[in-house]
């Protein structure tokens, strides 16, 4: 612990001697944008999973102050896993997706959204552990062969929307993914 503290102090001294200055407004703008992105995502997710957000619920979810970073990171890793056929990246991405779902559930609970909360929580727990991820991957392979509908195409849609900055669309696609998993 002392080593880390000394390292942080040295880093601070070195950065101040070189005139490196972190603009606190820039950091807060980034956090604010991430919260806005999360809010748009949460509203889109509700639409994708077919939860009706009326009046005050919509306003409450729109005012969420959670960060979109877990979902953003998850889509980046899943995209990398799909492009490079990297099981490790895909698994890490699914794990981050599950962690993001935990934040989403907390937002919905805080706003009084009761529909599907337990199901979304169960899915978030499932994709944050190794066994659940393996089951999801096996199920995905079977689903592609039997139904010609794959979660992969929904994930690609979410990734594409996220890349374009369409966080509502990204949320809709993610809501559809979770909706499909809930029906399994």
Swiss-Prot record:
Its main location: secreted. The keyword Secreted applies. Residues 1-19 form the signal peptide. GO terms for cellular component: extracellular region. A motif (Cell attachment site) lies at residues 164-166. It is found in: Secreted. Keywords: Glycoprotein, Secreted, Signal. Glycans are attached at residue 129. Belongs to the Sct family. PANTHER family: PROTEIN GP17, SECRETED PROTEIN B. This is Secreted protein B. The gene is 29C.
